[in-house]
Amino acid sequence: MSKQHTAQAPVDPIVLGKMGSSYGIRGWLRVFSSTEDAESIFDYQPWLIQKAGQWQVVELESWRHHNQDIIIKLKGVDDRDAANLLTNCEIIVDSSQLPELEEGDYYWKDLMGCQVVTTEGYSLGKVIDMMETGSNDVLVIKANLKDAFGIKERLVPFLDGQVIKKVDLTTRTIEVDWDPGF
């Protein structure tokens, strides 16, 4: 893997996908993209991976569709053995490479850890994950330890204006119109 070189850790890393199993004998790998449009993963370069605690830059040589998969060829990865060493490596970029969003749009990473409060002031907990359901995104909220309703986790739809009343990334709070009993 002579074409890979050591890199500095990204300031604000974000995972865009993951390398899957090798494909064929010439160093190709399957790739699993976490971007909204699977092919958008190729818009962000350079890719970084972390192997044995070291950050490395990997250079994309080529990519293509194969059946339902996307497969990639990285520079310097020329055989199945070299490709197998990269299986399960996360594909990471610095979040500064992401495009600016329009008002009212948010990256999931920016919502993680935000405190969620109802319009009446009841603290529902903190956002620990997000889910895509097809019709809308859903906040996964870990409830406070002493939740009055005995709820450990809440799923709240991210419906801007309807359920989501205000997102303040400066104070890391999300105000929702939601019944705490759900």
UniProtKB/Swiss-Prot annotation:
Ranges annotated as spanning the membrane: none
Any GO BP annotation: ribosomal small subunit biogenesis
Domain PRC barrel residue range list: 103-182
Annotated Gene Ontology cellular component terms: cytoplasm; ribosome
Intracellular or extracellular location(s): Cytoplasm
Source species, domain of life: Bacteria
Keywords annotated in UniProt: Chaperone, Cytoplasm, Ribosome biogenesis, rRNA processing
Pfam families documented for this protein: PRC_RimM, RimM
Description of its domains: The PRC barrel domain binds ribosomal protein uS19.
Family classification: Belongs to the RimM family.
Alphabetized HAMAP family for the sequence: Ribosome_mat_RimM (MF_00014)
Name under which the protein is recorded: Ribosome maturation factor RimM
Organism: Klebsiella pneumoniae subsp. pneumoniae (strain ATCC 700721 / MGH 78578)
Organism lineage: Bacteria, Pseudomonadati, Pseudomonadota, Gammaproteobacteria, Enterobacterales
